[in-house]
Design a protein with these regions (language model features):
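Short glycine-rich anion-binding loops that position phosphate/pyrophosphate groups of nucleotides
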Residues: 56, 148-151, 213, 303-305
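FAD-site-proximal beta/loop scaffold in flavoenzymes
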Residues: 161-193, 282-285, 291-364
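A conserved FAD-binding loop/helix module that cradles the flavin
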Residues: 345-384, 389
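Beta1-alpha1 glycine-rich phosphate/pyrophosphate-binding loop at the start
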Residues: 2-9, 13-16, 22-117, 201, ...
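FAD-binding core/adjacent interface of flavoenzyme oxidoreductases
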Residues: 4-11, 16, 26, 30-45, ...
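A Rossmann-like FAD-binding core segment of flavoenzymes
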Residues: 112-123, 217-326, 332
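C-terminal, flexible cofactor-proximal segment of oxidoreductases
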Residues: 4-5, 24, 30, 34, ...
Length: 466
């Protein structure tokens, strides 16, 4: 029911007829419940636009919402925040995607000065202080870029087309669905034809590659023979390929050696110092010329950043990362800041070539900048590394923490506790703990189901409304 206010006493409906006493009373009550103005209307508060809801963006948002009176707009192409260190568990069916993610709109509903805008950044206009998204334009007083990095295929379009990345929740679900489809299809084939569909090649010897190889090996040992008895004659192999001479290159030598021994114990084939050269969907070719026949290449071999339209080439440093000063603002734009993987800060004496592209760094930078923009600190940003850890398999992991090198059960327990406590909400922590307990005691994964929407479902739904 629409109303037209003609003076302080009389209200008319859309047909210009006076409202009844009941209608007028109801209209007054509804009007009293509405805000005097929309938060998108003119506002004298400083407007901070924050692009990216990853570790850096969320930590920065928490501090800004807590300490500042600024008006904040959070921009992300996805309407959820997720916990990247556990996406490999989603790809293996140990966890549901909802166990490690949380809706952004529900998250920001606790903050009166924060609004969410879904969209992908297309360009920045530093002169006019505006950004262009695929969903429209937004003006800003301060801009924070924390949009993270993308999977790095090192310019190889063939790899980008055929390899399976593991960077996002969508990637993890694609891997899960792909592998289940491969297992099911292989079960219908003669034994001699199954190998390429069951063999898995993982590119990248960092934590993501090692943890994925470990969990896939665990599925082979504890699950596959029960769920796919027809595949007992040939369950395929797992090969981990890395360009480095060791696994977990940033970690201690003792952790590297222990990881290598455990991988070999789990019957994971290891290939060192021989990066992937090409992959056509059927055959992996390494730099040495060695070939591996597989339909399953999972890519965890690094990340890269993209150039942002509107910024100049001198704004970028090595790896297409934005050059920032000691307060994380762009060298040439003091009203634009960068955080996380996309930021390159060279002022820190301990990291003269820039901080590593890690979640720890992103979280630390986000917390710092939120406090800095809220006036809670004026010191320069300095990063203190807390340590590294990696899960290898059931009851075994490695951890380098404050000079101590843990391995085996102790490292595994530390890894489990730290990762559970790092999840966003109590619901995430409880769900993850429960699903891990079920998998641990029963040897079964609850989410080994291939559930995919029809590829044209959204298109058909949209067209039906036209």
């Amino acid at each position: 029911m629409s109303t037209l206010i003609v003076d302080n006493e009389t209200k008319l409906n859309k047909n210009n007829q006076p409202l009844s006493s009941h209608q007028a009373s109801l209209s007054s009550k509804l009007s009293a419940q509405l805000p005097e103005k929309s938060p998108t209307e003119a506002d004298n508060r400083r407007h901070i636009v924050l692009i990216g809801a990853g570790f850096a963006g969320i930590r920065c948002l928490e501090q800004l919402a807590k300490y500042s009176a600024d008006r904040i707009t959070l921009v992300d192409r996805n309407d959820y925040h997720f916990f990247p260190p556990l996406i490999y568990q989603v790809s293996a069916g140990f966890l549901a995607s909802s166990d490690i993610s949380y809706p952004l709109r529900r998250y920001i509903s606790n903050y009166d000065n924060v609004r969410y805008r879904q969209g992908t950044l297309l360009s920045i206009n530093p002169k006019d202080k505006t950004i262009t998204l695929d969903t429209g334009e937004i003006s800003y007083d301060r801009l924070i870029i924390a949009k993270g990095a993308e999977t790095n295929y090192f310019g190889n379009q063939e790899l980008a087309m055929h390899a399976l990345p593991m960077k996002t929740i969508k990637d993890a679900l694609s891997i899960r669905n792909h592998m289940l489809s491969q297992f099911n299809y292989a079960a219908s084939l003669p034994v001699a034809e199954r190998e390429p569909y069951l063999s898995i090649v993982i590119a990248g010897g960092g934590p993501s590659g090692v943890e994925l190889a470990g969990v896939m090996s665990e599925i082979r040992r504890y699950t596959l023979h029960k769920e796919y008895p027809e595949l007992l004659d040939n369950i395929g192999g797992i090969t981990l390929v890395t360009a480095d001479p060791v696994l977990l290159a940033p970690m201690s030598e003792s952790s590297q050696q222990y990881t290598k021994l455990q991988m070999e114990k789990f019957r994971v084939d290891l290939i060192f110092s021989d990066p992937v050269k090409s992959y056509d969907g059927h055959m992996v070719t390494l730099q040495s010329g060695q070939t591996l026949h597989t339909h399953n290449l999972i890519w965890t071999a690094g990340v890269t950043c993209d150039f942002i339209q509107g910024l100049d080439t001198e704004d970028y440093g090595q790896g297409k990362r934005l050059l920032v000063d000691s307060h994380l603002s762009l060298i040439n734009h003091n009203d634009i800041y960068a955080l996380g993987d996309i930021a390159l800060a060279t002022h820190d004496e301990a990291y003269p070539k820039g901080h590593p592209q890690l979640g720890q760094v992103a979280s630390s930078q986000g917390t710092y900048l939120g406090k800095y923009l809220s006036g809670k600190t004026d010191k320069a940003f300095h990063y203190k590394h807390s340590g590294d850890m990696a899960m290898i398999g059931r009851l075994t992991a490695v951890a380098d923490i404050n000079g101590s090198h843990l391995k085996g059960f102790i490292a595994w327990f530390a890894w489990v506790v730290i990762h559970i406590l790092s999840l966003s909400t109590a619901k995430n922590r409880l769900a993850t703990t429960w699903n891990w307990m079920v998998a641990f005691f029963t040897g079964k994964q609850s989410f080994r189901m291939s559930i995919e929407p029809h590829e044209d479902s959204f298109k058909l739904k949209k067209e039906s409304k036209l």
